[in-house]
Swiss-Prot record:
Necessary cofactors: Mg(2+)
Keywords assigned: Acetylation, Cytoplasm, Cytoskeleton, GTP-binding, Hydrolase, Magnesium, Metal-binding, Microtubule, Nucleotide-binding
Protein's recorded name: Tubulin alpha-2 chain
Modified residues (N6-acetyllysine): K40
Record function comment: Tubulin is the major constituent of microtubules, a cylinder consisting of laterally associated linear protofilaments composed of alpha- and beta-tubulin heterodimers. Microtubules grow by the addition of GTP-tubulin dimers to the microtubule end, where a stabilizing cap forms. Below the cap, tubulin dimers are in GDP-bound state, owing to GTPase activity of alpha-tubulin.
E.C. code: 3.6.5.-
Top-rank lineage group of the source organism: Eukaryota
InterPro entries: Alpha_tubulin (IPR002452), Tub_FtsZ_C (IPR008280), Tubulin (IPR000217), Tubulin/FtsZ-like_C (IPR037103), Tubulin/FtsZ_2-layer-sand-dom (IPR018316), Tubulin/FtsZ_GTPase_sf (IPR036525), Tubulin_C (IPR023123), Tubulin_CS (IPR017975)
Localisation per UniProt entry: Cytoplasm, Cytoskeleton
Main location per the UniProt record: cytoplasm
Gene: TUBA2
UniProt keyword Cytoplasm present: yes
Assembly: Dimer of alpha and beta chains. A typical microtubule is a hollow water-filled tube with an outer diameter of 25 nm and an inner diameter of 15 nM. Alpha-beta heterodimers associate head-to-tail to form protofilaments running lengthwise along the microtubule wall with the beta-tubulin subunit facing the microtubule plus end conferring a structural polarity. Microtubules usually have 13 protofilaments but different protofilament numbers can be found in some organisms and specialized cells.
Residues annotated as catalytic: E254
Organism: Pelvetia fastigiata (Brown alga)
Length: 453
């Protein structure tokens, strides 16, 4: 089995986690108490969904997940929510005091106290796996817990489970919408850790998600529930190939192999189609070609950056539902002829496709329409550097005046860490620039060598 353990850190991680597990349960027909009426064989360990759920002797399905927060309110919502019976009580770990939007508190003072307990729980989950494939980490980079404790956990996971892949789903700060003044600090510090300790990071930002909700679903004032359900659809599409058997299945490690050309360049842009309300879907024929076109629309991106300003290095298309390879090939061929979608010149083909025959599921009473087929795109594009440089710029403005720095230093952090993290991100911006640069001048140099021999 290729089990995956999900780790949900801080408010953002836990709330997106709730939406994801709600959707997984609906997709697999698992009830909120963990029972699965359709599954007659108790202890049948070969079912594909066992990558995400473990089955107890009593036939109860328990998510392979850990919820961690440094303060209890969000965890208590899980403990009292609809799915309270789904989780093992030990899988939900909460501290007493908050990280207060401070990376240093999440990483050094308060996070330190809880991290061993969390790793112990993760170890228990890992021991239950026959072939652990990796970790999915859900967090926000702008808060205190998601950034600080998130980085600390990733560092420790690298030590304990070096070879296992770690994918992170990070809610990154948006250009206009901010929940904290110190977001740029937390974000730069945690991105510094993500660079080193994750194999692949999927960037999502709230502003882009708000826009998608407003534009495509006509929700005037989207709530976090609306956003999280959207995120859950994306994550469900990415993980569908692990949880169902399909025609062209894509493994977690396969993502990395196909999307990450250089270890540092692993920040992904995602989009999903069709994002459409029930009233509209009734009147539209959403063919494979149409949904494939719409995932490349800049307006549908889940991160605020414009892919037309960058070049694609690699692109994964995960289809689900009523889709056949022939249609996919035709749709991709059409995309390739479009001049708007530019690939770097050293990566001519650049598309990886996966098909899963399980149709997309929607939450009853949710915003999305039930459709026959859907596609999720994950792209590695140089345009994501836009989002990085935006955060860096905000960081520079505050750091030049050393504003708010005393809160971090007071929690036992050294000022040097700020500049170290910032330099690392400056190097990353440079890396993206070089990757997207034309390689034409390189050809001239090779010819010179030819004359020497």
């Amino acid at each position: 089995m290729r089990e995956c353990i999900s780790i949900h850190i801080g408010q953002a991680g836990i709330q997106t986690g709730n939406a994801c597990w709600e959707l997984y349960c609906l997709e697999h027909g698992i009830q909120p108490d963990g029972q699965m009426p359709s599954d007659k064989t108790i202890g049948g360990g070969d079912d594909a969904f066992n990558t995400f759920f473990s089955e107890t002797g009593a036939g109860k399905h328990v998510p392979r997940a850990v919820y961690v927060d440094l303060e209890p309110t969000v965890c208590d919502e899980v403990r009292t929510g609809t799915y309270r019976q789904l989780y093992h009580p030990e899988q939900i770990i909460s501290g007493k005091e908050d990280a207060a939007n401070n990376y240093a508190r999440g990483h050094y003072t308060i996070g330190k106290e809880i991290v061993d307990l969390v790793l112990d729980r993760i170890r228990k989950l890992a021991d239950n796996c026959t072939g652990l494939q990796g970790f999915l980490v859900f967090h926000a980079t702008g808060g205190g817990t998601g950034s600080g404790l998130g980085s600390l956990l990733l560092e420790r996971l690298s030590v304990d489970y070096g070879r296992k892949s770690k994918l992170s789903f990070a809610i990154t700060p948006a250009p206009q919408v901010a929940t904290a003044v110190v977001e740029p600090y937390n974000s730069v510090l945690s991105t510094h850790a993500l660079l080193e300790h994750t194999d692949c990071t999927f960037c999502l930002d709230n502003e882009a998600l708000y826009d998608v909700c407003r534009r495509n679903l006509d929700i005037e004032r989207p709530t976090y529930t609306n956003l999280n359900r959207l995120v859950a659809q994306v994550i469900s599409s990415l993980t569908a190939s692990l949880r169902f058997d399909g025609a062209l299945n894509v493994d977690v490690t396969e993502f990395q192999t196909n999307l990450v050309p250089y270890p540092r360049i692993h920040f992904m842009l995602t989009s999903y189609a069709p994002i459409i309300s029930a009233e509209k879907a009734y009147h539209e024929q959403l063919s494979v070609a149409e949904i494939t076109n719409s995932v490349f629309e800049p307006a549908g991106m889940m991160t605020n950056c414009d892919p037309r300003h960058g070049k694609y290095m690699a692109c994964c298309l995960m289809y689900r539902g009523d889709v056949v390879p022939k249609d996919v090939n035709a749709a991709v061929a059409t995309i390739k002829t479009k001049r708007t979608i530019q690939f770097v010149d050293w990566c001519p083909t650049g598309f990886k496709c996966g098909i899963n025959y399980q149709p997309p599921t929607v939450v009853p009473g949710g915003d999305l329409a039930r459709v026959q087929r859907a596609v999720c795109m994950v792209a590695n594009t140089t345009a994501i550097a836009e989002a990085l440089s935006r955060i860096d710029h905000k960081f520079d403005l505050m750091y030049a005046k050393r504003a708010f720095v005393h809160w971090y230093v007071g929690e036992g952090m050294e000022e040097g860490e700020f500049s170290e993290a910032r330099e690392d991100l400056a190097a990353l911006e440079k890396d993206y620039e070089e990757v997207g640069a034309e390689t034409a001048e390189g050809e001239g140099e090779e010819e010179d060598f030819g004359e020497e021999y």
